[in-house]
Amino acid sequence: MGADMGFRLPRLCLPRPGIDLQRWAVVACDQYTSEPEYWAQVQQLVGDAPSTLNLIFPEVYLGKADAPQRIERIQAAMRQYLADGLLREHEGAVYVERTIDGHGGPRVRRGLMLELDLEHYDFSRTSASLIRPTEGTMIERVAPRIAVRGGAELELPHILVLIDDPAGTVIAP
C-alpha cells in the first residue's frame, strides 16, 4: 500500500497502558539546540520515569566529549524498554489531532503517522524527489544520528510531512 507514493502502513511501538505520557513524550532531538537549560529541565521532569528522552540524542549535546557514552546509554535504554515490555506493537496508521493557537482562535490540525520509504527521499537543496525537506539539512548532524541508529533496536523518527491538499481530500473533518 502506498509504495509508489513513498509511504506504507507501519508497525508502531506505543507505550503500554500505565506509562505517564506527560513524561514519556518529549520534543524532537533537533529542537532547543542552543538551550541546554531546556533539556536539563526536561531531565528533571522525567526523572527515572520511562521516557523517549532516554531514547534520543538531543542535538544540544552534539560535539560533547561524552557523545559515545550517551549513544551507548540510548541503545541500552532501547533494549531495556523492550525487555521490560514497556512498548506494545501495533500495525497500521495512527490518526493524530493537534490543537494549535492560530489567528482567530484555536485550530485543529489532523494527521497520520505513516512509514516513509526513504528511497524516495533526497535532502539536497535542488531535490525534486517525492519526499524532500522544506528546510536545509545540517550535514554535521547526520553522523551522530547514524551512530545512534547503528546499534538501535528502535527508530524514533521526527519527521512532519506536509502535503498539498487545499480541498481537504486526504484528511478532512
Regions found by a protein language model. Give the residues of each.
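N-terminal extension/subdomain marker
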Residues: M1-A172
